[in-house]
Amino acid sequence: MSDWRHLTEAGVRRARELLRGRPTLSVVVPVYNVAEYVEKSLRSVLDQPRREISGLEVIVVDDGSTDGSAQILRRMAAEEACVTVITQPNSGVSTARHTGIDAATGDLLTFVDPDDTLPVDAWSAMVRSLRRTGSDFAVGAAERVAVEGGVERRFMTPLMRRNHAAERLRCRIEDAPLMLADIFVWNKVFRRSFWTENAIVFPERTRYQDQVALTQVFLAADSFDVMTEVVYDWQVRADRSSATQKRAQLANLVERIDTKRQTIDLVRAGGSAHLMQTLLVEVLPIDMWEHFRAAVHPDTEDPLRYWELLRGAVLEFWYDAGVPFEDTTVPAVQRLMAWLVAQDRAEDLAALIAMIDRYGARKAVVRHPWREDPALPPDLRDIHRDIHKVGRGALLTWQPMRG
């Protein structure tokens, strides 16, 4: 028998994989008050084909649920030998994931959120690729799934589609910098040794725990594999209490700003100037428009403080860094929003958003009223081409609301 005493953990893992040909996979599922969805989610995990793995362990961490989730988990664990349930006082999703990671014993590691589902055969391509390339992790595409009027609708964000248009093996983040935008943990399969050796952690008590951890992951990886297959179904629910539906909360904005700041610090310390440029120009601006809208929404919590924090972040992350927001790659209407924030023009921002809401960004063409402002960057003087291409005569001239 081979003597493994002098091998590292990673070496032992690779030796075992060579001997049996197929690795084992640990799936970590943090659960808190999702009784309506968790059984369907876990069924989609348990129904996965296992031809590429020699063993499956599903570690479900009940984070102090009070809605009946715990009873469902205990029943499923009694029915399925590969399911282990760990119960802990409510501590947040990051702590629950860490508990699951600590209990994992598989060669490979992946994650599932308890109100989402997996498509048929979610893991095979990623596991097969890792066996072939030796990369630290593999990442597949994710689709958002919404049910409207009883009809299921699937869609993929443009950047997700762009990132997964072609298979790319043994990538480094410097070679595929836009992958920094893939800030989700659940569409990836990791070598567990890679995760533990690099001490990857999810920040505690934040709505945006994945972005910092995944930035660490991309920077630490010697290589990763990008797959074209859809490996995760991200369920969009009308009643879902997700971070993306709570932008108007002050705490939400504070956590988003802190997450972006931590991400910038990580890339500045561990990446190239090119990677930093990509982060500022193409990645970090993507979701800012939601906060621009929230800043002038009537239900926004403490609107004066919200505006102050938002404007400070826009100035700090872009203008003070020498990358004006108008030089980013988001649509021009969003760049105009950012410019109005930077100029401290809340009333004008509210007027712009009211116009877009009234006519619809896909139906109306906006010629905004500040195009003669000498301070306005030239490419923001006419933004209608970025909003929608329409026929002649559809141009709308609009004057801002007067208070």
Predicted regions and their residues:
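Nucleotide-sugar donor-binding/catalytic module of glycosyltransferases
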Residues: M1-R256, Q262, H384, K389-G391, ...
